[in-house]
Amino acid sequence: MELPPNPGLVDVQRDALYAYDSEAHKAVVNSRPWTNDHKYFKTVRISSVAMIKMVMHARSGGNLEVMGMMQGYIEGSTMVITDAYRLPVEGTETRVNAQDEANEYMVEYLRLCREENRLENVIGWYHSHPGYGCWLSGIDVGTQSLQQQFNEPFVAVVIDPDRTVSQNKVEIGAFRTIPEGIKPFAATNTTTGDGQSVPLNKVEDFGAHSHRYYALDVEHFKSTLDSKLLETLWNKYWVQTLAQNPLLTNRDYTSSQMVDLGSRISKASKSLEMLSTTGQRGPKSDAVDQNIEKLLSEVKQIAAKERSGLMAAEVKGKVFGCGCRGQAEGVQPEKS
C-alpha cells in the first residue's frame, strides 16, 4: 500500500536541484562551453545524501584509499552532484586502482538506475586521501585528464577522512585538470587549500603536479526530506556524539601528524645549521625562516587541539560523571 504524500516533506522550490531535466543537460553537453574556457566550471554542489555516502565510504577505508563515482548534471557553470556510489576496487595507502570488476559494476549499476527512472549520468569520481589533504597526485591528474578527454563533463573530488574527524567538518576538495596545450598555472607552495601542510613524504608529488589542475568551490544542499531525516538522526544519536572523545577517535592521525612534524623540524634544523655555518643571508635564508614560522604555527595548532580535547573530556566528566577524563588513557590536562 502506497502512503499518501506528506506536504511537510516536500518543498518544490527547495528541492528543485533534484529535478533532473535530461533535455537541458543534453543541450549543455552538446554545446560544450568548457572547450572555450578551461576554467568554465566554477562550483560543485553536492547533495547531503552524496556527501554522507562519500564520507562514510572514505572513513571505512581507514588508512587505505577508496574510490567511487558520482552522478548528477550540469547547471550553467555549476556541477550538481545528486548521488554517489562506491566501487569494488583495490586500494593502497598511496593509490587506488580500478579493475575490470569495477567497470562491470559501473555498467550494471547504471542499468539498474535507468530501470528505476534515475536518469542522472556519471559526471565525476571521488577518492580518499587519508591524512594528507585534498589535492591531486600525479596518478590522479592522469586519471582526471583522461576522463576529461573522453567523458566530459567530469570532476574529481577528494576527501580526507582523518582531517574530517580531527576538524569536525568535512575536508573535501573538487578539481579539474588543465587541458594539454593550455599554459599551466604557476606551481603552488606545500600547503593545501585550507592552509594545512602536506606531509613530508607527499610534498614532492604535490609540488610536481599542483600547476596542472585548479580547484572548484564546493557547496552542499539538502532537500526537505533530508532535513527531517538528519534532525531525526541527531535526536537519536546526540548522546553518542557528545560522549565521543576526539583524542581517542583520531589518535592514529594525531600520532602521524607528530611524526611528520618531527621529520620536518629535523630537516629545517639541518637547513638552519648550514646557513649558520656559511653565514649567508638572502632568499634561501628567508625561505628557511618562513618554513620555521610555519612549523611553529603547526606545533601550536596541534597543542591547542590536544588541550581542547582534554578540556572537553574534563568538562564531560564533571557534568555527567561519566569518567570521560580517564578515557584519555591517563593523559592529564594542563593546569593553569
Swiss-Prot record:
Protein name according to UniProt: COP9 signalosome complex subunit 5
Subcellular location: Cytoplasm; Nucleus
PANTHER family: EUKARYOTIC TRANSLATION INITIATION FACTOR 3 -RELATED
CDD domains: MPN_RPN11_CSN5 (cd08069)
GO biological process: protein deneddylation; proteolysis; regulation of cell cycle
Pfam family, one: CSN5_C
UniProt keyword terms in alphabetical order: Cytoplasm, Hydrolase, Metal-binding, Metalloprotease, Nucleus, Protease, Signalosome, Zinc
Presence of the UniProt keyword Secreted in the record: no
Family: Belongs to the peptidase M67A family. CSN5 subfamily.
Organism (species): Neurospora crassa (strain ATCC 24698 / 74-OR23-1A / CBS 708.71 / DSM 1257 / FGSC 987)
Zinc is among the record's keywords: yes
Residues involved in Zn(2+) binding: H127, H129, D140
Gene Ontology cellular component terms for the protein in this record: COP9 signalosome; cytoplasm
Gene label: csn-5
